Amino acid sequence: TNSQITWKLQGEYSAKFANTHEVEAMHRTEIRKTWYKSISANGYGYDRKTLQTKPVIFPNETWAKLYPLYNESYVENAFASFFATGSYTFKQRYTLGGSVRFDGSDMFGVAKKYRFLPLYSVSGLWRLSDEPWLEETEWLNNLALRASYGIQGNIDKNTSSYVMGDYQNVTILPGNTEEMISVSTPPNSKLRWEKTKTFTAGVDLGVLNNAINLSVDFYTRNSSDLIATQLLTLESGFASMLVNWASLRNTGVEISIGTRNIHTKDFMWMTNFNFAYNNNKVLREQIPENQTTPGREGYPVGAIFALKSAGIDDEGYPLFYNKQGEKVTATELLKLNAAGASN
């Protein structure tokens, strides 16, 4: 069964003074709790041919535990959000806006300071087409410059701040099984939100009675505290763990062009063109030397790597260059990569 309780409270304010000043504000609070309970039962001894069920007698208690008749699981999470937005416009030409958001979740570290993340954004717009020195330009309907900056947060639901283990029955000696819990993930009391800081600058243009509209956006996104693999010393008992420490940068441009080609009472023809370019780079990451996923430091995410060929040897086997620029066979290269991964 899935259950959820949500409590929301919202307030809005809007006012206009002397056709010059416009003020808008909004506040909202949301508290949500979800829980999931699963119960399953299994039966043994059913014969599909006779459509009858025969009792199954296990030779001992250990064997019976390998085939449980009843399973139950329970998951519970809580979220809280508090946010507000506001904007001020002067003479319908200059607009300043901002927002503040405070999100919290019990999915993060034991320390309370990691459970909440303050988010914010600021933005501005200058509508040049309404300026007196451009107002008389008949072919220009809209020309606006805008910019924004803000920070966003993300939850990785595949991680946990607590010790994770697998309960299982293992065979120690022939005919004998033991119950055990295998620890698969070490605890992480500092697990926290993934953060992304975004700066965007854009321009909007509309001409010829808005028959042609153009929007261009340039953006830079710097992501930090990303959940990524960090190698650990062997003394810890784990080879690696997922922690907040990787960083990534995205830069790009997005262009949108819309045209109204024909517009009559019986027929309308409009076209839209979109172009987007994005370039990303892993700024901080740590993975074994012989791995390339999810991304190597200094390269784009999902970059494709290839070995530099050095031709073939006298017997026709391929040769490759190692890091020192020496020619090695494929077998030698694999041994070097394996040694580098273990080191």
Predicted features along the sequence, with ranges:
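Short linear proline/tyrosine/threonine-rich motifs used for host-factor recruitment
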Residues: 318-320, 327-329
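Short aromatic-centered micro-motifs
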Residues: 88, 320-321
